[in-house]
């Protein structure tokens, strides 16, 4: 009976290596498709897999062919419509189509639809939050926040050719060939010694010598059939993400839920905060999040109430800033914590309250936070709150502000606010 032993790590997913190579090769096109797809999802469905489409021309192999542009001279036998020097107009319409669903119809021509494939939840989130980090993160005395970094982790039997370890593969090849031929080599050595003795003995034993020479030839043939290198010998450099303890961090999420925030504006604010939550939980470990909702009064709430509560009212933005300052003083020592804040509002505020917001941020919050981001979600002209915050942006480097007009702006604004800088972690 013959037994087959499958030693592949990806036995049930044999194309995993090719899949990873494909994701790396077309990362730019995939990320572009993801940035477009995220705006089409519901508020609660941003962390599942995604069907990604790539234009066929982006994945086609390069090839040389005759160009279709410019002027050409051709001879058309039997032509009765044109004479020499006539210019032939280019055909109008689809002209073959690209399969993208755009353009006009054509009665002839061929094309291909865009290439569509499914990526997993982990692949989706990895690409979604690639090259993002908390700005100005500082290593404090008490280290509880864990950041994941890529490290060498020995060797693996599966991988891409670029990561192959030649030395380790040859060592495995030598060990395998030694183990598979050791017994035969011992037997061969014994037969050669016997043949030497018989050859020197008198009288000559020709039949015995012939038998020994035949056995020696068969053994050498068996030894030579053992391959020099086998797929079982190949070893690849392995990399894995390991937790890297860095520092303590807390993120304050301040959301305006006043009456001026219609449901569409609130949904866009929630999308931004869900992206922020997924980014923090995906990239860091043990980071704390403080949720604050405000209208005329501010209130610290849990995650469920922050996203689903229907409470509303007037607008006094300073109430949220005052509550944040109180929470910082009570629970988060700036010497031990990296403090971050993300504020989302439609910019509508009581006029006399906007200067107070400027004062609280300038004197109390911005001196102690690592990074403060303000996101204004509106299609109207900016009001007093935006203008007061513009003065802060020109004074404080750790203050950033962005404008979201519609749903398509959410992800680009998020990446702009949290793109990875050259020196994110400071000692």
Swiss-Prot record:
Residues 92-102 have a biased composition (Gly residues). Residues 84-110 are annotated as: Disordered. Pfam families: DUF444 (PF04285). This is UPF0229 protein YeaH. Belongs to the UPF0229 family. The lineage of its organism: Bacteria, Pseudomonadati, Pseudomonadota, Gammaproteobacteria, Enterobacterales. Transmembrane segments: none annotated. It comes from the Bacteria. NCBIfam families: PRK05325.1-2, PRK05325.1-3.
């Amino acid at each position: 009976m013959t037994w087959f032993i499958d030693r592949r790590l990806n036995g049930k997913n044999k194309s995993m290596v090719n899949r990873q190579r494909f994701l790396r090769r077309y990362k730019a096109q995939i990320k572009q498709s993801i940035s477009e797809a995220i705006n089409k999802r519901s508020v609660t469905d941003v962390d599942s897999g995604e069907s990604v489409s790539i234009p066929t021309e982006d994945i086609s192999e390069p090839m040389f062919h005759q160009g279709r542009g410019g002027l050409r001279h051709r001879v058309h036998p039997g032509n009765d419509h044109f004479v020499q020097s006539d210019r032939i107009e280019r055909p109008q319409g689809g002209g073959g189509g690209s399969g993208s669903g755009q353009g006009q119809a054509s009665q002839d021509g061929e094309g291909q639809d865009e290439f569509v494939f499914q990526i997993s939840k982990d692949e989706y989130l990895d690409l979604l939050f690639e090259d993002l980090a908390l700005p100005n993160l500082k290593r404090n005395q008490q280290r509880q926040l864990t950041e994941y970094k890529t490290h060498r982790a020995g060797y693996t039997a599966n991988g891409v050719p670029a990561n192959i370890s030649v030395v380790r593969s040859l060592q495995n090849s030598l060990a395998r060939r030694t183990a598979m031929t050791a017994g035969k080599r011992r037997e061969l050595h014994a037969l050669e010694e016997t043949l030497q003795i018989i050859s020197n003995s008198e009288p000559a034993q020709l039949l015995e010598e012939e038998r020994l020479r035949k056995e020696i030839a068969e053994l050498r043939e068996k030894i030579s059939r053992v391959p020099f290198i086998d797929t079982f010998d190949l070893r690849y450099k392995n990399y894995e993400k390991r937790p890297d303890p860095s520092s303590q961090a807390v993120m304050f999420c301040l959301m305006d839920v006043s009456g001026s925030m219609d449901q569409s504006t609130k949904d866009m604010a929630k999308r931004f905060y869900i992206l922020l939550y997924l980014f923090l939980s995906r990239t860091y470990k043990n980071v704390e999040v403080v949720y604050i909702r405000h209208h005329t009064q501010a209130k610290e709430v849990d995650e469920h109430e922050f996203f689903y509560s229907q409470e509303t009212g007037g607008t006094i933005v300073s109430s949220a800033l005052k509550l944040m300052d109180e929470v910082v003083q009570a629970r988060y020592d700036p010497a031990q914590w990296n403090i971050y804040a993300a504020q989302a509002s439609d910019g509508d505020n009581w006029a006399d309250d906007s200067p107070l917001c400027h004062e609280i941020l300038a004197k109390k919050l911005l001196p102690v936070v690592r990074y403060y981001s303000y996101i204004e979600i509106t299609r109207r002209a900016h009001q007093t709150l935006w203008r007061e915050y513009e003065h802060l942006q020109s004074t404080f480097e750790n203050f950033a502000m962005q404008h979201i007009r519609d749903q398509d702006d959410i992800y680009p604004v998020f990446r702009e606010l949290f793109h990875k800088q050259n020196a994110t972690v400071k000692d």
